[in-house]
Regions:
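Phosphate/pyrophosphate-binding catalytic cores of soluble transferases and nucleic-acid-acting enzymes
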Residues: 1-314
Length: 314
């Protein structure tokens, strides 16, 4: 029988962390984070990583497990998180996946579907050298020759996925589109019960995101960016491109005032939340809970408990 896990998903600032903890306490679970930025050490403020108090004694996994200089893909996340989920299950506990990185959540549930090739290996370095020298156009033209399906799907600005598609083909002889099509037919590794959180009124979500960004500034986001630079983290590191960090680099460079940076972080956070919702709404398995003016966690816990109990958990 496919083991069951719970997924708590939603856009930034919607209360996933709190509901995940409440469900873990109710169902004897442990939280596994699925946030592509909370994996990094030294970035607790800008990623809104849960504090010890917010964890309420519930074990949390996959938070602050990587150096900010590292670059993780969904494949690396799955490789690290799967043994943790399996260990939680082996101890009779319920894994509760919490996060806003929908691709990583889907990938962990599938448990397969990653094309071969050694991401970051010699082939990737050669492709990156060519990209730095010649730009993306010749590489995209090459992708059209070997994998037209991927080339047609990818925007020229999506250089990361263009390089990855070429890397897979050059290392394995198989196109990434063919590989993905084949693996979509395979059964998932886990049977996921999805709980989704979002606001009924987008204006309420906007207000909450704005308050969260202000709180990050008060808690020392600028100082966190300075600390990362002081430890030698390059400005072009993936971690530094996260919302909040990139903008506050501008403050340190003198190209933005702190207030301008804050407004830009708020705008980009709202845009990111919209993209998160677009991704998640494609998933028909999600049981959505809609917040009204405020986030009523007692009500959300009650609804979630009913959903999980009906799914055979509890």
């Amino acid at each position: 029988m496919t083991p069951k896990i719970v997924c708590v998903a939603g856009p930034t600032a919607c209360g996933k962390t709190t509901l995940g903890v409440l469900l873990a306490r109710r169902f004897h679970g442990e939280v596994v984070s699925a946030d592509s930025m909370q994996i990094y050490r030294g970035m607790t403020v800008g990623t809104a990583a849960p504090t010890e108090a917010e964890m309420q004694g519930v074990p949390h996994h996959m938070i602050a497990v990587a150096e900010p200089s590292e670059q993780w893909s969904a494949a690396e996340y799955v490789a690290k998180a799967t043994p943790i989920v399996d260990d939680i299950l082996s101890r009779g506990k319920l894994p509760i996946l919490v996060g806003g990185t929908g691709l990583w959540m889907d990938a962990l549930i599938r448990g397969h579907g990653f094309a071969g090739g050694h991401a970051g290996g010699e082939v990737r370095r050669e492709l990156e050298t060519r990209f730095d020298r010649d730009g993306i156009e010749p590489l995209l033209a090459e992708l059209w020759q070997v994998d037209p399906e991927s080339a047609a799907r990818l925007h020229p600005a999506d250089t990361k996925r263009i390089l990855r598609a070429l890397e897979v083909y050059l290392e394995t002889g198989e196109t990434i589109s063919a590989h993905n099509a084949a693996t979509r037919q395979l059964p998932p590794r886990y049977d996921a019960v999805w709980i989704g959180l979002q606001f009924a009124d987008r204006a309420d979500m906007k207000a909450l995101i704005d308050r969260r960004v202000d709180k990050m500034a008060e808690e020392g986001l600028l100082e966190e960016v300075q600390a990362l630079l002081a430890m030698g983290l390059p400005r072009n590191a993936t971690a530094m491109q996260a919302i909040g960090y990139k903008e506050f680099l501008g403050v340190l460079d003198g190209t933005l005032t702190e207030q301008e940076a804050l407004e830009l972080v708020k705008l980009r956070s709202r845009q990111y939340a919209k993209r998160q919702l677009t991704w998640l709404r494609r998933n028909p398995a999600i049981h959505w809970i809609y917040w009204e003016k405020d986030r009523d966690f007692a009500r959300a816990l009650q609804i979630s408990t009913e959903i999980l109990t009906a799914s055979g958990l509890g």
